[in-house]
Regions:
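Short, glycine-/small- and polar/acidic-enriched structural segments
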Residues: 2-152, 156-161, 179-181
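Extracytoplasmic/periplasmic substrate-binding proteins
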Residues: 170-183
């Protein structure tokens, strides 16, 4: 076993969830410790802040989609992408079946929840590609709280992790949940 280095900090891109399984399995099996790494895994208060927190040197590493790294570099942060956790993020549009949303085109006239600085841009770009005017729906910044926002009727649909928020919402509402993978 190697000598442990000082603590290394890793800021997740979200609350801990199945997406992060490889990180926690490696910690549980002692793989970091075997490499001399004393890893502190942290969750963000707001996933939008991760690249800035890493860029300011407040943590050693952070998880974010590549688009956020590019944007942070454009803002002057000296960040480097060193790997990927999954080939494709498990994100998509999530809504209760009772909302009537079955396809991306069904967002017209609806309130669409998004996360972070790029969420609205992503929704609008996808809408334009689908031939939908961005003025035909309302966007609402909801942060990490998609299930809560849907349950409190703040949004009809939103971008979220299909591997756990879809399950969480179905559990909270006892209702079938629609999802459309965005990749």
């Amino acid at each position: 076993m190697q000598t442990l280095h000082s603590r290394t900090t890793l800021l997740l891109n979200w609350r801990a969830n199945p997406y992060h399984t490889p990180i926690f399995v490696a910690q549980a099996k002692g793989y970091y410790r075997q490499e001399g790494i004393q890893l502190a895994i942290m969750e963000p208060n707001d996933p939008s802040d991760v690249t800035e927190i890493v860029g300011l040197g407040k943590v050693d590493f952070g998880l974010k989609a590549m688009i956020h790294t590019v944007a942070a570099r454009a803002k002057g942060y000296h960040l480097t992408s060193i790997g990927t956790l999954l080939d494709e993020p498990p994100t998509g549009l999530i809504a209760l079946k009772s909302s009537g949303i079955k396809t991306f085109h069904d967002i017209v006239g609806k309130r669409v929840g998004y996360i972070g600085e790029f969420g609205k841009k992503i929704i609008d770009d996808l809408a334009i590609l689908a031939g939908i005017e961005p003025t035909s729906y309302e966007t609402v910044r909801i942060g990490m709280n998609l299930s809560d926002a849907i349950c409190r009727n703040k949004v009809d649909v939103g971008i979220g992790f299909i591997n756990f928020q879809r399950v969480e919402l179905a559990h909270l509402r006892g209702e079938t949940v629609f999802y459309l993978l965005i990749n």
